[in-house]
Structures are given as C-alpha cells and as structure tokens.
Regions:
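Short, surface-exposed loop/turn microsegments at beta-strand edges and helix-strand junctions
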Residues: 8-18, 31-39, 49-53, 67-79, ...
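Low-complexity, Lys/Gly-biased intrinsically disordered segments
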Residues: 1-30, 43-49, 64, 111
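Amphipathic alpha-helical coiled-coil/heptad-repeat segments
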Residues: 89-90, 94-105, 109-116, 121-182
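Juxtamembrane "helix exit" motif at the C-terminal ends of alpha-helical transmembrane segments
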Residues: 30-31, 174
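Residues that scaffold the ATP/ADP-binding catalytic core of kinase and kinase-like folds
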Residues: 27-28, 68, 106
Length: 182
C-alpha cells in the first residue's frame, strides 16, 4: 500500500519514481519516463513490490482499469497497478500488446461495488498463448526497433518541451532576442 503521505521521511526529497494511474493517464505513447511524485528510500522500504526494473509493464487495475505503459525508469507503484516483469520468454512490448488486445477480457475480470478493480488473482487466470520461439524472435526483430524509436522520440519531445519552457518566458519578456527574426 501507499506509504503515509503525512510522513515526510517517505516523500520529502524523494529520488525514486512513484507511479500512480494518474501518471499514465493522457499518455500519447505507452512509455513511462518519469512520475509526478518521488519517494525516498524510507518510503520505498514500506512497499512490498519494491522498485520495479526498467521494462516492467504497468497496467492500471482500478480507477480506471486499462492504462498501460512500459517503465523506462526504475519505478515504485501504488496498489492501483498490476506490474508485469518481463524477463523471460515474452518481451515487454509483446506483453503490452497482449494487454491491449486482451483489454476486454481483462476488464471482464473486474468486480467491486464502490469501483471496479481487477485483482491480481483474477488477472493471473487469463490465458496467454505463447508462440514458438522463432515467431517470438521474428516479432521482436520487427517491433522492438519501433518501440525503441518511440522511446527516443518521447525523450526528445520531453527535452524540447523543457527548452521551450525555459526560452519562451525569456522571449516574451525581452530577456532574449533573436537576431534577424523579421
């Protein structure tokens, strides 16, 4: 569960990404590069899932169900996620795409009176067809470079947005002038 937000030792000057479903909402691409909040080592010690590795597929399991991303940074999560560590036969991109294609079945496993939630046990009961290694390798050779390009583009976009956020106020205030801008 989420370490107490009233305990400053868990949050103040935190250095570890702390993901909530809100961090995945509105994402154009399923890539988690950063989170709104950071958690400290002390806060991280209170979380049973610990710090999840890069490549973990995150699926919001409640409020709402179905936000997806691949963590591109080590990330701690709140209880609103199902985290899938992909260090075996199936790649992160394969698992992400399986989730997209299986979303109707995933949501069908939800229950709850106050709000719908997919429990980890009901999620685990969903069948996954694992293709032969030759097909999985072919899939990875085609899809992994495309996903890597998405990650690079997302990093570049974030970098350009930071430059814009620094330069625009300077341009508007006259602090920076562009020569020959006529």
């Amino acid at each position: 569960s989420t370490p107490s937000t009233k305990e400053t030792a868990f949050w103040e000057n935190g250095k570890h990404c702390w993901a909530t479903p809100k961090d995945l909402s509105g994402k154009q691409f399923p890539v988690l590069m950063d989170t709104d909040r950071k958690i400290t080592d002390a806060g991280l010690a209170k979380i049973s899932s610990g710090l999840l590795p890069v490549g973990t597929v995150l699926l919001s399991s409640r409020a709402p169900i179905g936000y997806l991303a691949i963590a591109e940074v080590p990330t701690a999560i709140n209880q609103g996620f199902i985290a899938m560590k992909c260090n075996g036969v199936l790649s992160s991109v394969f698992v992400l795409m399986w989730c997209v294609e299986s979303m109707e079945a995933i949501i069908g496993k939800s229950n709850g009176s106050t709000f719908q939630e997919v429990s980890k046990s009901s999620f685990r009961s969903l069948p996954v067809v694992i293709s032969p290694a030759l097909i999985l390798d072919g899939f990875s050779k085609i899809v992994e470079p495309l996903y890597r390009r998405i990650v690079v583009n997302e990093r570049e976009s974030r970098f350009l947005a930071r430059i814009r956020d620094v330069l625009l106020p300077e341009l508007i205030s006259g602090g920076v002038r562009i020569q020959n801008a006529e």
